[in-house]
């Protein structure tokens, strides 16, 4: 009897297990089918994104050199303080080379200079080169200036280990240079590239090297951990140095330095023979602005980086790559295939060129956002003279763009935001200096394309200044996510603007501002 019961229970147990297994198999099959379907959809989406990105890269490959790297080789920094600490740490640990290209180094940046000094003392094999703009770097001379501060490093370590160069635009010479005030003469062209190379890494940014950029002036900062990219920009840097004046310390000069044109430089010098200088500069720079004749690809990588330069004052014919790349991207976004894309465009100074403005309005995006500094976050806020009128001038240009958005019937798709964090020159007040573009493809959640660098996308950037940028094109989900996060956090202090906001009394622009804009354009400069 007991045996029968046991056998009955065993049979029942087997039947239950069999039924459960059948049930589980059914669920597994459903899950497997669902997973396969999801994977297939993901694959189709991935293939679609890849083919769309190929439209961009196919054109970019005709324009610029390309470097295929791992997405992990790109680090995105968030704050001025993080940028400063990262830069100092990398300089302290430098073994072979440090090259720093910037508009200027603050004349009181003794802590930063001490960081370079300690690195030179710690490593006798280290060589340091610094490139700034002549006009900005010597503005305060014979009082303490950027140039005199850097000359102290040469005095201490010698010209074999420390080099300081000052680029002078060929557009400002003779009588014009003699009569224009120092604060205004920078409108005729500057060395504006921000290249911070340390050994085999480079930080690309729009930030200069002074206290506000280290504390309360918001910008963007990407670290590229790539020897080929760092070497490329090193070659560009070296070439511009050979087109620039060399600083030497001097006890005889009240300024503490002299700027001379070495015989080893590209000849002639810009202040003596501007046209001859441009001709010689074009010869040495054109190869750097051209794509290689033979393309090498690395199929295993998912991220490409295109170095883009704008060297218009030095190139005849002008073979600069930044403006053609940017306008090419915007034209592509305006085609039916890319309807429904999303983009964010930002610049500290709201003064994009008419061509860029028109192309943005032709993109028909699912959403487009322009972010610019509010007048109270503009570095010129409170300045004296014409420069003090610039925040109001940029405000006027922002209003005109928003009017154009409305006229194009895109008010529901394109937004203009102004960034403000307190008021500049008051406790807790920040300025906004970030620039770039992020492009998110249709049906995607995060950007696949991003442009970062020194350019402000203005008439000045494309006709008078030297600019250097990198364009990132990626299929890597993690890098896309990080670019998306950067795009969002830069808008933490940004507020959407309306036409009514610009009509408020405090935002109205007087005749004197319009007159100042006209004068600056008339005499040959650019905002």
Predicted regions and their residues:
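PLD/PLD-like phosphodiesterase catalytic module centered on the HKD motif
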Residues: 2-92, 110-203, 207, 211-216, ...
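Active-site cores of enzymes that catalyze phosphoryl transfer or operate on phosphate-rich substrates
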Residues: 46-75, 80, 257-328
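Short acidic, glycine-rich surface-loop motifs adjacent to enzyme active sites
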Residues: 95, 100-102
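Non-catalytic, alpha-helical, charged scaffold/linker segments
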Residues: 233, 243-267
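Short coil/turn segments at secondary-structure boundaries
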Residues: 249-253, 299, 498-503
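A Trp-anchored, charged/polar loop motif used as the substrate-binding/catalytic surface
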Residues: 318-334, 349-354
